[in-house]
């Protein structure tokens, strides 16, 4: 095979007389002439493998062409490849043309003017026979595949040819049938043409006859007219002749001799006149003669009578034809008159039908409009039904989730109950071992001291037995009211039996005290038992009920007994040595009493300093708890009992008792104890309302969704619902009798019982603890904690520095520390236009712009830049339960006054947060708070609305939900736009505008004491 390029062969065949270098330069010039086309069309990554195989490019050149940053686009890389090949000389040119011949044959034809032959000269020179053999095998495989595809195509074409042959046979048969039909059609066409020619001939003959008849009729008419003219002329001549004769006669008669000179003068004139008359008479005579001669000649002609007869026949024929045509015209006229009458009847009929159709058309149009309106109404109702269905599905899913959570909680409670039973059994075992120890001590004391010490040990043994047999779990502390709060010390028999029944119900079925063991069994157990028994605690017990209650097993155990009476010989050292004394004494024991007066047989001065007398109240359902002192426990101070129990004292005692029932080394304290001021103000308002029965309704707002209860009369209270208090001491239990109030019309919806303030706090605290513990147990607890911003409060004994560092950590920590189940609210009807606050804060600027872009929105809204009021950062008080201080800044009052001045004109769109809303309400400005719900379903639309594609969905959700935590602490009502109420940004702006207009006409519920006084533009509803 030859090793030169195809371009050189083409030039040699063309017979160009220049040398190889001139030819090469000429071809490179041709390549440079179409360089722009080559750089745009060629792919260097496709050409470099073949050029590397031809050894005109090395690895460095390939890397420079394909991987360098100097040539960002493909055109630059192709140009650099052409420059490198031109530097390689003739070999580069030949390899470039062969590559074009293989991969770009159209550009090879453009450069050389030849069709690509795909020869392999360069491969043979560079790679040798092996490379060529491999290349040829590749080509053979390609040709075989092409041959197979060609054979397959031939088979397809043959099958198609057979189908076409069958189709051709069918078409030939149809062609023969069409030819026969065409022959028949040709014969019919010839017959038709012959008949047409005969018809034309007959029409021509008829036309000639008609023309002849018309000519004869014209000749007849002209002859008749001529005869009439001649007859008229004859008559005129005759008349003229007779007139002239009469004149001549008169002239002759009047002729006489001329009278003198006048007659002589008139004689020439008369002679002239006479000559003229004579000449005229001669002329007339001559003309008459000529006429007579012509008449005679006419009369004397032989064919005159026949022509007149012919003319008469023609005239008669014409008359008859005229009669016939007249008759036909009359008939046609009659027919036309009948058709006209029929057409008029049809016109009247059609006009009547047109009027009926018009009436039907109008009726149908009205029916169509009615049906359109009905369809629009039905579609709107369907949309509402779909929304209600979605809401029902969501509520069903939520209820199912709550039910599953309740099942999980039930399982957790069962596990805790089993753990507590195990702990109780271990405690009973410990008490039994203590009893064995005491029995040993009794035996030793009996041998050494005698019977007196034995009696003391026996009394101690009986007291410990009573104490060990009366441990029980109290889920709900019973309220003190009526006979329990005001009864005598001893109590009545029905009350005692009822309390005993309650005690029997609350005693666990396994808490049965075994009989005291003998001395031998005690010694044997001491040898067999481990000297260090396991330590257990009641920490889980407080998580379930919030308190551990010790109820009296016998009437002999007094509620005012001191801790010294429990241990008459002092605290035994053996109990502390066995490892369970400290853990046991660190637990507080709450003893339920039947009255606040001391029982009979004991004087008030016999009370120990550790006892804590108190009084419950009927509002909170608090009971008096007695705290047993021990190592590590705080000493309670003596409180002076008041004459009448108030809600504040009962709440304080209940809170203190609840706090002391918790372990002191636990990592969290009760959050509701830190908001004593809110509890104090709430109970003061409740007492004031109870003392005045004719006062205004007592409205409260549920700040949280309370857990559902098994009581059939209990109300299922959701967050932000308004309740009206009816009976604060319903059946003397820890619950209120309330009615759910419609927030728009103030009408009562349904009635039932709800937990009172302290009971609701306990339920919320237990629920919060369970949620926190479930978050800690889940593998993603830290991630959820960061996403939801939950921060546990520090222990009560922690340092001030630690608490100060942790309190401002997350925005919801303040809400957790002020766990208020209810808030005292009042309805207000604001007549002036209220300002608008949009939440979350990151959506407020964009939503404000979209609201202002809506048509006619600038007539209702305006932007009031409040500069975030600079006072919304509230000062955090040092004490956890202390009230928050409002910062007094110089510019705050002026900005609020600016907002108040613009309230009466338009709705002010404010870019404020939840804390700014507190300042506005404090300044007697009640804004409309609109919160847009952000969920995983609409977070992408929210991100597109903000125009920040770089944000992650989790970051946006965390920011929006962080602002959502502040909503539950607002002192006024707010409205939320759910995620299913809108689909895109424009619809969101319309929905927000509609909610603003709706909220303007509604009542606003404001917390009592949140503002300085009643506003001038608002009134009590």
Curated annotation (Swiss-Prot):
Phosphoserine: residues carrying this PTM: 18
GO annotation (BP), single: regulation of apoptotic process
Compositional bias annotation for Basic and acidic residues: 495-508, 525-535
Highest taxon of the lineage: Eukaryota
Boundaries of every CARD domain copy: 23-115
SUPFAM superfamilies: DEATH domain
Tissue specificity note: Highly expressed in kidney, heart followed by brain, lung, liver, skeletal muscle and testis.
Coiled coil: 138-450
UniProt keyword annotations, A-Z: Coiled coil, Phosphoprotein
Gene disruption: observed consequences: Deletion mice show impaired tissue repairing. In addition, more infiltration of inflammatory cells was found in deletion mice compared with control mice.
Record region (Disordered): 1-24, 475-544, 597-616, 790-809
Keyword Membrane: no
InterPro entries, alphabetized: CARD, CARD_CARD10, DEATH-like_dom_sf, P-loop_NTPase
Disulfide bonds: none
Subunit structure: CARD10 and BCL10 bind to each other by CARD-CARD interaction. They both participate in a complex with MALT1, where MALT1 binds to BCL10. Interacts with TMEM43; this interaction is essential for EGFR-mediated NF-kappa-B activation.
Protein task: Scaffold protein that plays an important role in mediating the activation of NF-kappa-B via BCL10 or EGFR.
Protein name: Caspase recruitment domain-containing protein 10
């Amino acid at each position: 095979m030859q090793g030169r390029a195809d371009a050189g062969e083409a030039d040699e065949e063309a017979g160009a007389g220049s040398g190889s270098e001139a030819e090469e330069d000429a071809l490179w010039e041709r390549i440079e002439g179409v360089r722009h086309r080559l750089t745009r069309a060629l792919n260097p990554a496709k050409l470099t493998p073949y050029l590397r195989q031809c050894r005109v490019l090395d690895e460095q050149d390939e890397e420079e062409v394909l991987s360098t940053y100097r040539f960002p686009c493909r055109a630059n890389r192709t140009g650099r490849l052409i420059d490198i090949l031109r530097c390689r000389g003739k070999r580069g040119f030949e390899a470039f043309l062969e590559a074009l011949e293989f991969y770009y044959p159209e550009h090879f034809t453009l450069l050389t003017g030849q069709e690509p032959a795909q020869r392999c000269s360069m491969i043979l020179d560079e790679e040798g026979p092996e490379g060529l053999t491999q290349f040829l095998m590749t080509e053979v495989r390609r040709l075989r595949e092409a041959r197979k595809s060609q054979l397959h195509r031939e088979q397809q074409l043959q099958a198609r040819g057979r189908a076409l042959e069958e189709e051709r046979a069918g078409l030939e048969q149809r062609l023969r049938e069409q030819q026969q039909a065409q022959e028949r059609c040709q014969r019919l066409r010839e017959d038709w043409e012959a008949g047409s020619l005969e018809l034309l001939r007959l029409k021509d003959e008829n036309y000639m006859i008609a023309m002849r008849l018309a000519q004869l009729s014209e000749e007849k008419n002209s002859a008749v007219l001529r005869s009439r003219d001649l007859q008229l002329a004859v008559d005129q001549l005759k008349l003229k002749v007779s007139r002239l004769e009469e004149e001549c006669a008169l002239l002759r008669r009047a002729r006489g001799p001329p009278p003198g000179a006048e007659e002589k003068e008139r004689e020439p004139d008369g002679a002239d006149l006479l000559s003229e008359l004579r000449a005229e008479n001669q002329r007339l005579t001559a003309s008459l003669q000529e006429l007579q001669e012509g008449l005679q000649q006419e009369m004397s002609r032989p064919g005159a009578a026949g022509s007149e007869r012919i003319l008469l026949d023609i005239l008669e024929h014409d008359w008859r034809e005229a009669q016939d045509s007249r008759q036909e015209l009359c008939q046609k006229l009659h027919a036309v008159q009948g058709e006209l009458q029929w057409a008029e009847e049809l016109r009247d009929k059609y006009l009547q039908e047109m009027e009926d159709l018009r009436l039907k058309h109008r009726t149908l149009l009205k029916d169509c409009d009615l049906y359109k309106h009905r369809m629009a109404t039905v579609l709107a109702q369907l949309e509402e039904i779909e929304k209600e269905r979605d809401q029902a599905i969501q509520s069903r899913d939520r209820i199912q989730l709550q039910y599953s959570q309740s099942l999980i909680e039930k399982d957790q409670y069962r596990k805790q109950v089993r753990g507590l039973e195990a702990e109780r059994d271990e405690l009973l075992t410990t008490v039994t071992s203590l009893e064995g120890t005491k029995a040993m001590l009794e035996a030793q004391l009996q041998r050494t001291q005698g019977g007196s010490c034995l009696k003391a040990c026996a009394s101690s043994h009986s007291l410990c037995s009573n104490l060990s047999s009366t441990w029980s779990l109290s889920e709900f502390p019973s309220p003190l009211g009526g006979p329990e709060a005001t009864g005598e010390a001893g109590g009545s028999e029905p009350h005692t039996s009822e309390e005993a029944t309650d005690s029997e119900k609350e005693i666990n079925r396994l808490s049965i005290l075994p009989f005291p063991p003998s001395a031998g069994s005690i010694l044997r157990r001491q040898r067999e038992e481990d000297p260090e028994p396991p330590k257990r605690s009641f920490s889980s017990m407080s998580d379930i009920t919030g308190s551990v209650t010790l109820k009296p097993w016998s009437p002999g155990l007094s509620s005012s007994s001191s801790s010294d009476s429990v241990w008459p010989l002092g605290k035994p050292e053996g109990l502390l040595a066995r490892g369970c004394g400290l853990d046991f004494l660190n637990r507080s024991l709450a003893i339920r009493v039947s009255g606040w007066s001391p029982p009979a047989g004991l004087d008030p001065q016999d009370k120990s300093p550790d006892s804590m007398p108190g009084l419950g109240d009927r509002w909170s359902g608090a009971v008096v708890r007695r705290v047993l002192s021990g190592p590590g426990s705080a000493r309670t101070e003596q409180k002076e009992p008041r004459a009448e129990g108030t809600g504040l004292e009962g709440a304080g005692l209940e809170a203190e008792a609840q706090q002391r029932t918790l372990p002191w080394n636990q990592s969290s304290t009760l959050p509701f104890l830190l908001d004593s001021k809110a509890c104090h103000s709430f109970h003061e308002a409740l007492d004031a309302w109870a003392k005045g029965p004719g006062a205004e309704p007592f409205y409260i707002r549920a700040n949280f969704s309370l857990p559902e209860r098994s009581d059939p009369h209990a109300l299922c209270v959701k967050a932000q619902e308004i309740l009206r208090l009816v009976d604060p001491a319903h059946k003397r239990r820890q619950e209120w009798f309330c009615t759910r109030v419609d927030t728009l019309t103030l009408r009562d919806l349904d009635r039932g019982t709800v937990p009172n303030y302290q009971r609701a706090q306990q339920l919320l605290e237990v629920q919060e603890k369970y949620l926190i513990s479930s978050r800690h147990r889940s593998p993603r607890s830290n991630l959820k904690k960061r996403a939801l911003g939950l921060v546990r409060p520090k222990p009560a004994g922690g340092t001030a520095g630690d608490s100060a560092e942790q309190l401002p950590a997350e925005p919801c920590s303040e809400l957790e520390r002020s766990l208020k189940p209810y808030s005292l609210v009042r309805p207000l009807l604001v007549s002036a236009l209220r300002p608008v606050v949009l939440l979350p804060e990151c959506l407020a600027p964009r939503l404000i712009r979209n609201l202002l872009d809506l048509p006619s929105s600038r007539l209702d809204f305006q932007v009031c830049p409040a500069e975030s009021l600079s006072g919304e950062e509230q000062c955090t008080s040092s004490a956890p339960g202390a009230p928050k201080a409002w910062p007094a800044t110089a510019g705050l009052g002026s900005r609020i006054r600016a907002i108040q001045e613009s309230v009466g004109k338009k709705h002010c769109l404010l870019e404020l947060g939840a804390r700014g809303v507190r300042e506005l309400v404090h300044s007697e400005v009640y804004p409309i708070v609109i919160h847009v719900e952000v969920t995983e379903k609409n977070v992408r639309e929210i991100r597109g609305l903000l125009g920040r594609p770089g944000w992650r969905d989790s970051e946006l959700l965390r920011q929006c939900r962080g602002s959502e935590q502040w909503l539950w602490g607002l002192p006024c009502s707010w409205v939320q736009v759910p995620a299913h109420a809108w689909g895109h940004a424009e619809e969101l702006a319309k929905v927000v505008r509609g909610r603003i207009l709706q909220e303007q006409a509604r009542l606003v519920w404001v917390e009592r004491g949140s503002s300085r006084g009643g506003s001038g533009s608002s009134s009590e509803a």
